[in-house]
Amino acid sequence: MTQQNAQSTSEPTISENDLIAQRHAKLKQIQDVAKETGKSPWPNTFKREHYAADLQEQFKDQSKEQIESAEHVYVKVAGRVMLNRGSFMVIQDMTGRIQLYVDRKGLPKDTLETIKGLDLGDIIAAEGYIGRSGKGDLYVHLEGFELLTKSLRPLPDKFHGLNDTEVKYRKRYLDLIVNEETRKTFEIRAKVVAGIRAFLTNERFMEVETPMMHVIPGGASARPFETHHNALDMPLFLRIAPELYLKRLVVGGFERVFEINRNFRNEGVSTRHNPEFTMIEFYQAYADYKDLMALTENMLEKLAIDILGTTDVPYQGEVFSFKGPFKKISMFDAILENNPQFTPENVGDREFLAKFVREELKEEVKPGFGLGKLQTIVFEETVETKLRQPTFITEYPAETSPLARRNDDNPHITDRFEFFIGGRELANGFSELNDPIDQAERFQAQVAEKDAGDDEAMHYDAEFVEALEYGLPPTAGEGIGIDRLVMLFADAPSIRDVILFPHMRRKEG
């Protein structure tokens, strides 16, 4: 057969606009019938009593013969039509899928005609009794049926699915309908959040809520989003971190607090960064950073077991062990371990590191950059991506840790850690700075850096310093990125895969 003949005998392709027009025509028929009978074309009186997954679980051990020989079990289900073959359909609800058997001899003619005219994506209610096919599939033997919602747009072709990444992000509702893996990802996300909440609540932490709009951006080094309060005629900033408010609560006597909420940072978008993201921050009085490292080990190990059933977490071709204790190493030693060309003297030499950053890393060295800032740059550029298995990096420079407590033995470093896995930072924690005089001086140093051109340096927060002057007990605090943690448990390559509605560039037109 020639190419021309093959094309001439192929099925004509129906455009999406034509399919939409056909569905609108069907809706018009439904509306006309509803008008004649006095019923609503969008009924809302059906009450579902059963879910697909529950029925699959309930009858999983019963054979076709056992089900047929027993008394009929009647059920009421509802869901979206994912397959319609005339004699049987498949509907999908929030828990999974189940078949509906259409008995042509036992149903009225008008019901059969309605079923025949169903489109994929329509939402229906069904009543009947449980059965099992010769192939072993559980089904509902249809005795009652109602169209609840007419779908006016066709679902993606079942053979090609929804594979366009941008469409998946922009139309997440469509992605959730047709892609089971996407639904599983967000079920994992819900379990992660619930698991963290339960773990901390069990440890006597109290969940709180703090402001999302701040008069002064603080709590982290980042560029904020700015807005304006019309009634008060004043600028406000979407929060970059809740830290300074949570520590005020510890001053007030809430000795163990946590908050799960959004932070906003007016920075770049990548596979690891979204301008709006979810964090868990928690603070514990009468504890230090070592206590929080232990708590983090216990919490992550429990999450892995509860969600995945194992402490071996597969991620993008690697396997990460969430079985504690995790590796712990200072930033200074991590730089040496991953840069064999360096000596301890090199890592402690500002001029040497400044030259290395300029000439080897090709990054600008501003006049205000001290030794600690340069060490941090070298660490971020030469070490971070090599930290594959769970690792705590400790002893961060005081220069880049304006809210952390100085180490008692070495005032140039702080009692701080960052937690890395798969080459990515997942958590940041430290013994809190509770010396109001030292805090004021560090805020002043940050202001000087901001004046020198560092957009991410912190502002001076006089109200927070005043709160510290009333007395903050010895305290440790930590923040964990929920989105990045979900990426690990869901084996998702991009942060956009674990955020229901990630930020996208506005479409032209």
From Swiss-Prot:
Binding site for Mg(2+) 1: 418, 425
Stored InterPro entries: Aa-tRNA-synt_II (IPR004364), aa-tRNA-synth_II (IPR006195), aa-tRNA-synth_II/BPL/LPL (IPR045864), Lys-tRNA-ligase_II (IPR002313), Lys-tRNA-ligase_II_N (IPR044136), Lys-tRNA-synth_II_C (IPR018149), NA-bd_OB-fold (IPR012340), NA-bd_OB_tRNA (IPR004365)
GO cellular component: a single term: cytosol
Subcellular location: Cytoplasm
Cofactor: Mg(2+)
GO term, biological process aspect, one: lysyl-tRNA aminoacylation
Catalysis: reaction(s): tRNA(Lys) + L-lysine + ATP = L-lysyl-tRNA(Lys) + AMP + diphosphate
Primary location: cytoplasm
Subunit structure: Homodimer.
Protein family per UniProt: Belongs to the class-II aminoacyl-tRNA synthetase family.
Name of protein: Lysine--tRNA ligase
Source organism (scientific name): Acinetobacter baumannii (strain ATCC 17978 / DSM 105126 / CIP 53.77 / LMG 1025 / NCDC KC755 / 5377)
Gene name of this polypeptide: lysS
